[in-house]
Amino acid sequence: MAKNQDESKEKRKNLVLSRFRWSEQWRRPWDDKWLRWYKTFRGIVPKLPEGEEDRSNLHIPYTYSTVDAVRSKLLTACFANRPYVSFVPKDADDVENAKNMETLVDSQMNRTDVEFMVRMYTLITDMLIYGGCPYEVGWRYELRKIKRKVPMVDESGILLGYEEQEIEVVNWDDPDFQPFMIDDLYPDPEGTSIDDCSWVIRRRYITRKELEAKIDEGIYKVKDLEAINQAGDRISEGKQDRLAAIGAADAYADEADVGGRRYELLEMWEDDRVTTVINRTEVIRDEENPFWHGKKPFGFAKFDPLNGEFYGISLVEVIEHLQAELNTTRNQRIDATSQTINRMWIVLKGMGLEPADLVSRPNGIIWVDSMEEVPKEVEFKPPDPAAYQEESIIKADIQEATSTYNEARGAPSDTKRTATENAIRERATNIRFETKLRIFEALGLKRLGFFYDQLNQQFIDDIRSIRISGEDGGYEWQEMRPEDIAGRFEYQPAGSSIEPTLDKLEYRTNLLNLYNEFKEDPEIKTLELKKRVFEAFGIKDTEKLIKSEEEIMQEQQEELAAQGELQAMLAGGGGLLPGMGGGMY
């Protein structure tokens, strides 16, 4: 039996390694592109040839400013409102549970120790640089030992002092969202998306301490740790290649240079199975997919998807050659200007002049035997004014390709336009951003909501006390049981739309005037009109702010009942309120 298990693991190991090599070979052209785009984003330029070190070799950070403009707009639009993801019930019985799940997920995404925004920031950054960014969502359970001071009292209750005690608490028992480098994702070359791939391999690196912790938890089963150690140390190749490209690390560093021993894990996920190979020598995990949702626990956010292709188009890819042209144009202009500033001379051989004699100095004198032997200055023409116009054309091309005009960057416009022209231009720009926003919401936030939902329903098996913000600005606590979050839901990102800034104020003002004009009109549905007003201010979850017709009717009935009680009290007390008589107090 043991022999059959060993043979089965050997087959699985060979399958993982063969698929890894296949994906690695297929992905190689993208590896070169990713490194090139990373260097463009970081502003890394090749060194000048020997003897030409005095030439200008600048990188103009226009790619960075373009990425930053798009990144800021996407991040602001997606996370303008909380909760970031709304849960919509599929069945009528799940309305209340959808609200509970929404509250739970919102609290999990906004834990003070989660740094959700930082992770989203890095995800969007990588997506813009490389065209996509993979992320993994699993369940994380973590215990932590903390020290506390406990009061010590005697039998009579007198405080004697404090004793230091060490206790173990649950530090994390929630979903864990982790973006990771695109270099560490090896997809099925035949697939076009995570779900479409028959398998996906994630490469990761862990320390010995992390490995031993997983062994203790029973997740990994190691047969021969010594053989694994002898297989050699591993380094994060993609990360080291990037750092080496900017001169920040040695791509061939040994273990001492990267902080100690690392173990490479090749984790192959199929919809129904997961297999992990360590240091390409031994299978340490081979089991059924532990997640109820039955999917690979990955997502892949794309900036610009292409039909039939796994990787999309990168923002840096679009402007890469324009950035190179911008660098060349600026450096050529600087070199030309330097030539006009740094004067050169034509001097006959044998005149006895030294180069130092031709250096400009106060009251300087150049001695010659004849005026015919006067050194002649070499004249260089200053750069043509058209060279400055060329840079503006290049920047305009970049702005047109990425829809990041000066107004979107917070810079003044180069051209004077009328207010109408600016409004039309901004609407067209925002339509393009809105499209990119919808793609990111579909591939990022909706899938993230799906994972959080499914993992919560699977792993929460006790009563949870959720901290929520109260109406008075304080905090309230809401208890939730597993049955309170069960159900089938759909996911709707709650971010605000990207509105034109030039005409939105006028639109809102007109809408408010319209509301004031018709709010008392019996033929107008006032609630629907109120929704339009809220939506004009970018608020989507209007149902949380506007009372339903049922709630309004109930309040009216309660008010009528209260008035009836008051009238009855007045009638029974002779028209006076209780406690009031005709005398003096």
Which sequence ranges carry the predicted segments?
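Basic/charged alpha-beta structural segments of nucleotide/phosphate-handling enzymes
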Residues: A69-V70
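Long, contiguous juxta-domain segments that are non-catalytic but functionally important
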Residues: S56-Y62
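C-terminal anchoring/interaction modules
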Residues: M1-E53, S107, M127, Y135, ...
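Extended, regular secondary-structure scaffolds
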Residues: K3, N97-A324, T329
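Juxtamembrane loop-helix boundary motifs flanking transmembrane segments in multi-pass membrane proteins
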Residues: D93-N97, E390
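Helix-loop-helix transmembrane hairpins and adjacent membrane-interface loops
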Residues: V85-S86, Y135
